[in-house]
Amino acid sequence: MPPAPPDQKPCHQLQPAPYRALSESILFGSVDEERWWHSTAPILSRLLISSNYDVDVQYKYLSLYRHLVLPALGPYPQRDPETGIIATQWRSGMVLTGLPIEFSNNVARALIRIGVDPVTADSGTAQDPFNTTRPKVYLETAARLLPGVDLTRFYEFETELVITKAEEAVLQANPDLFRSPWKSQILTAMDLQKSGTVLVKAYFYPQPKSAVTGRSTEDLLVNAIRKVDREGRFETQLANLQRYIERRRRGLHVPGVTADKPPATAADKAFDACSFFPHFLSTDLVEPGKSRVKFYASERHVNLQMVEDIWTFGGLRRDPDALRGLELLRHFWADIQMREGYYTMPRGFCELGKSSAGFEAPMMFHFHLDGSQSPFPDPQMYVCVFGMNSRKLVEGLTTFYRRVGWEEMASHYQGNFLANYPDEDFEKAAHLCAYVSFAYKNGGAYVTLYNHSFNPVGDVSFPN
């Protein structure tokens, strides 16, 4: 039986009451923190209200945001007076605009997640060119604040996947070894449960480590997982995933290119030449015996035929749930009018002030290694919708919500989404949602939106 339809209530206030009340009593640590708060906290507050969090839980999460997250966002973005481009010194690999903050909305469960790339004023400078120090400090602070956070998995994966000081020095002395603009190695996220508990996650991107050691991303990721998985909980699922990756590398299951194949970018060269390439992993920061691992891979062929191949592991995963999920995924793809083509890794970021129309990137999948009896890890698809018209995308999502019986979401989501961006021209905006993910869990659709989470304030705002 499919899960109950998710909650969604209208929330269009420019200054939601919890945000307004806290703003009147906060002593900020710096002007940067104050500006980050007013640029982001109203969006978070509206998301919590519209997703029907209890009022006391809303205040708890906004307070957590102020005390833990704001100090980790680093210097506030600056607007270039000549180009009008708004950007931070450190370009975060978490967000295509380079910003270090992203709120995502799991609409299937009406749950909100806060993604953070913790930074300092030194991040991206010669003192800390790959931002290796601040994420650990941030997570250690989170572990002191939040019950149940266990950093064992973080330390284990950090040792295997993050460059050392000596390796950082090699990359600085030899810049041609790693020319990709995507330099983030550790990202973080907090799932805000409606009970008031928080699930903290860490994400590891080993491309700098790959460049300096000469080991492939796949080799680094797979060996790190096997090293921490001492009881072999993930072995069957991981081995089947590796077999699929190897078949793809040998040229099996590959459709014809649907568009003129563009040349590889500098970011592409950090990965396998195969169109389907291992990318990064994430882990829950709970006690190791309960921690899940998700293995992420990207696909440059963005079309439904390739989605179906990955979803079924080349036709090997064909249990009833997999096929029901695939049928629903086909409707989802059609409803959002997903574009298709061959998309390389972007040449660089699309900072605020640049045109986002037509911006393209590969799609991604994560494979959930959970230690269950299932021989294949459950996949979740992420399609890049940055560069597609944001209003049309939300209209397509509304069509899908009605298709699956999410009437409250269909009635209120579009208005709630647009309320987060009061100064945007929705006929032109193409950057308000970066990715949409789809999975099939517990007999129903599982959809998450990764949304733009920043409205500039003060002298950084766009001129009228």
Curated annotation (Swiss-Prot):
Q: Which pathway or pathways does this protein act in?
A: Mycotoxin biosynthesis
MF terms (GO), sorted A to Z:
aminopeptidase activity; prenyltransferase activity
Q: Name one GO biological process term.
A: proteolysis
Residue numbers binding brevianamide F: M94, E102, Y205
Q: Which UniProt keywords apply?
A: Aminopeptidase, Hydrolase, Prenyltransferase, Protease, Transferase, Virulence
InterPro entries of this UniProt entry?
Aro_prenylTrfase, Aro_prenylTrfase_DMATS, DMATS-type_fun
Q: What EC number(s) has UniProt assigned to this enzyme?
A: 2.5.1.106, 3.4.11.17
Asked if tRNA processing is a keyword of the record, the answer is no
Xref: Pfam families? Trp_DMAT (PF11991)
For the site Required for regioselectivity, which positions are given? Answer: G115
Catalytic activity field = brevianamide F + dimethylallyl diphosphate = tryprostatin B + diphosphate; an N-terminal L-tryptophanyl-L-alpha-aminoacyl-[peptide] + H2O = an N-terminal L-alpha-aminoacyl-[peptide] + L-tryptophan
Q: What does this protein do?
A: Brevianamide F prenyltransferase; part of the gene cluster that mediates the biosynthesis of fumitremorgins, indole alkaloids that carry not only intriguing chemical structures, but also interesting biological and pharmacological activities. The biosynthesis of fumitremorgin-type alkaloids begins by condensation of the two amino acids L-tryptophan and L-proline to brevianamide F, catalyzed by the non-ribosomal peptide synthetase ftmA.
Q: Which family does it belong to?
A: Belongs to the tryptophan dimethylallyltransferase family.
> Can you say what this protein is called?
Tryprostatin B synthase ftmPT1
Designated gene of the protein: ftmPT1
